[in-house]
Amino acid sequence: MNTFSQVWVFSDTPSRLPELMNGAQALANQINTFVLNDADGAQAIQLGANHVWKLSGKPDDRMIEDYADVMADTIRQHGADGLVLLPNTRRGKLLAAKLGYRLNAAVSNDASAVSVQDGKATVKHMVYGGLAIGEERIATPYAVLTISSGTFDVAQPDASRTGETHTVEWQAPAVAITRTATQARQSNSVDLDKARLVVSVGRGIGSKENIALAEQLCKAIGAELACSRPVAENEKWMEHERYVGISNLMLKPELYLAVGISGQIQHMVGANASQTIFAINKDKNAPIFQFADYGIVGDAVKILPALTAALAR
């Protein structure tokens, strides 16, 4: 048997749902999708869900992760085994851990390939900081996976599809996560997974102010802007959602233009599937040039304005 009888899907990020649903179609006979509202439910059915389970009734001061109890109960009530697919977001990984505990299931994070053999999931993901690919065969009846962006193609919606909708009512967990405060952050409205052209900046850009040079190039060629992990996590120059690498975005654009990025393996894992890689770096020995199809050795601050002017003609 090369499929599960049932797969359960949940995405806290709507843009990741089409990819997860496409993977679900390949891995199971019946697709169940947990959603938070009616609009997401309608989208899930168009993407192939046979059953939609609307999570309802959570108090405003509680976290989505506290739906884990009722989600696990619902999964158990509809089969003695199954596959759970979640995005490899922070919330996805936290929810995966909670579901794994409640289902007595093995959990595998950041999956880059998934297959089913004899009713058991086989999962591949990066290990040793991206230096190798590990393969795991999950033996537990339930398997909980968080999926790296780009692992599956994106499912296409079909308005003619139909499915059944159910409501799953909130039940307060024995130990709850209570939200005590919220802090607004800059939202990322760009879906980098779908970008044809990507300009990505590293610390070699020099300063937060110099990122404007990359933004001007993006505008000239119709590209989207991304970054390396240090730019987002260490320097805080850009939002977390834009960094490319093993623990976040895995992109497959037609062009990936790396500006001031050294090219460590942890970053290149997220960019190496690009059709063409173009690198700009003042260090001629930077590892990025081993991956690049084209490269310029020089100061990005001087090269970017000239490149923008040439391409804007």
Curated annotation (Swiss-Prot):
Q: Which of UniProt's keywords are assigned here?
A: Electron transport, FAD, Flavoprotein, Transport
Name the Pfam families for this protein: ETF, ETF_alpha
Q: Which GO molecular function, any one, fits this protein according to its record? A: electron transfer activity
Task: Fetch the InterPro entries from UniProt.
Answer: DHS-like_NAD/FAD-binding_dom, ETF_a/b_N, ETF_a/FixB, ETF_asu_C, ETF_asu_C_CS, FixB, Rossmann-like_a/b/a_fold
Which residues hold FAD?
Answer: 255-283
User: So, what pathway does this thing act in?
Assistant: Amine and polyamine metabolism; carnitine metabolism
Q: What family classification does the UniProt entry report for this protein?
A: Belongs to the ETF alpha-subunit/FixB family.
> Main role?
Required for anaerobic carnitine reduction. May bring reductant to CaiA.
Cross-referenced HAMAP family: FixB
Please identify the protein, giving its name as recorded: Protein FixB
Organism of origin is Escherichia coli O6:H1 (strain CFT073 / ATCC 700928 / UPEC)
Corresponding gene?
fixB
